[in-house]
Amino acid sequence: MSFYFKYYRQNLYFEKAIRYDEIYFSSNEELNDPLDLSFTPYFDDNEVAWEKLLQVKPKVEMLNIALYLDTTSYELASELNSIFKGSTLAYQQTIKPLIDSKNKELKRIFIKHINNAIESEYTSDKNSNFSNFDTEAKAEMCILFLTEILSRGWSKKFYSCSFFKNALEPKMWAHYADGFKGCVIIYESNENSSIKLKPHFSSIEYVPYAFSKVQYTNIEKKLSILEYMLNNNIVSSPLLTKNSFWSYEQEYRLLLSEEFNSIHLAQMDKMPTTNSRERIFYHLQESIIGIIFGARCSNDYKDKIRAILGEKRSYIKPKGFYSFDTELTTDGKVVIKSGSICR
């Protein structure tokens, strides 16, 4: 088991966190680092990936481009690779605007390959409901197929909840604990460095969420859309990377992803806006084992918080929790002044 620390200001959110066992997953817009949880989705130079992508089955039969052209064509994969390689997406942008910007090129390529298929008698869609489509309409179906398939490679929004390994970092107390007036909650993890959470207060089932260590480096954060779509991997590295000047934080974080329907995304220019209430999760009561008070935290507030935690811990075993007071030394260090077990 390990211990993780979370800094809080004196406010309603802190009191909700300790009363109701809440934790909140933040979006990029809510974080103090505008580059956090943000990275650049891009198309790498990967003809093999395009060959594989053309074999992916669509969610709607009308978009099955195998009805209209030879999806095994290396030439088609190569041409699509040439059109898209090097392209990037802006943060929160969907695939659709990029597809729209390349509509003429894509239509030209698909019409060529549809005509090639007809001439070579590669395919016959006479038994298809879409056999009466003209060539241009079929090309539009191919573009819609591409939009939907690629949307699967960029269909999520990501959120994080931050914890830390150092409870006595002066900068953290200054920035995140309201100038040493706030508190640090001590959380105990499971044996596999995770914490069990449930998405609703009334839910019964808890799911483990892993504490992941943040890496600090100044490299550009990028993600290959093709690789992500084909491998269906959870994005982790870009979400666990911050610039080096944040290294004093020694952060660990929980990650949450929200996936959107690729059919809907294929018709949208930007990612949907979501309800922040859906990002409040609940942990087990016993996950909180103690509290550390800031050097400028008042005695009245300490008594109030101890009373809240004491009441909650009275219903579980073992009863009690750790309580620590800190002080800020003249040389700028935060040290433990005193501690006790409150029962």
Regions found by a protein language model. Give the residues of each.
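Partner-binding and oligomerization surfaces adjacent to conserved cores of proteins
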Residues: 1-343
